[in-house]
Amino acid sequence: MVTVYVLLSIKDKATYVGMALNVLSRLKEHNSGKNRYTKAHMPWKIIYTEQFPDWATTRAKEKYLKSTAGKNWLKKYFDKN
């Protein structure tokens, strides 16, 4: 299973959307400063995950979550929860 995830910066409330086979391992990479964008906003915490059976479906969801419609959906999702 491949997971799409959303991270929230504890420092400045920035968000980051990505996908990985092992989300916890990927979170450690983000929090160790190995990614240029996420390094500036460390530390991060996982706020949303969703699993899919293949990379293509996961990539489509990631692309959606990065779109304006997806950002609006995430905002509504977290306003409810």
Say what each PLM segment does.
Residues 1-35, 40-81:
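GIY-YIG nuclease catalytic motif and its immediate N-terminal context
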